[in-house]
From Swiss-Prot:
Gene Ontology biological-process annotations: translation
Name the record gives this protein: Small ribosomal subunit protein uS12
Ranges annotated as biased composition (Basic residues): 109-124
Alphabetical list of CDD domains matching this protein: Ribosomal_S12
3-methylthioaspartic acid carried by residues: 89
CC annotations in GO: small ribosomal subunit
Region feature (Disordered): 102-124
């Protein structure tokens, strides 16, 4: 345990927490323009073709973001909304595209968990 005089001369350092989503610049979401839309394969135990997009943000960052849900309408020059949230089996993908916002359509024929995929309530 440090003495009072030791703490006066050399105060305790606050640990600096590094942001997991630096491109958002402390905002909840950011707008961006797709520069490339493509598929990529996940890390070792998993196997799939994951849909991702390279996005140029208004904060001047270029990030890779994941397109969740089945099917999408994104192409180059689509304007999208980005939120934080990494994809564990895709290295370097630390952002998600928000479905149902700006140029991104919601997922068709989705019944459960609709709010996560920008789907309107079905006509009963």
């Amino acid at each position: 345990m440090a003495t009072i005089n030791q703490l006066v001369n050399n105060p305790r350092k606050r640990s600096v927490v590094k942001s997991k989503v630096p491109a958002l610049k402390a905002c909840p979401q950011r707008r961006g323009v797709c520069t490339r839309v493509y598929t990529t394969t996940p890390k070792k135990p998993n196997s799939a073709l994951r849909k991702v997009a390279r996005v140029r943000l208004t904060s001047r960052f270029e990030v890779t973001s994941y397109i969740g849900g089945e099917g999408h309408n994104l192409q180059e020059h689509s304007v999208v909304l980005i939120r934080g949230g990494r994809v564990k089996d895709l290295p370097g993908v630390r952002y998600h595209i928000v479905r149902g916002a700006l140029d991104t359509s919601g997922v068709n024929n989705r019944k459960h968990g609709r709010s996560k995929y920008g789907t309107k309530r079905p006509k009963s």
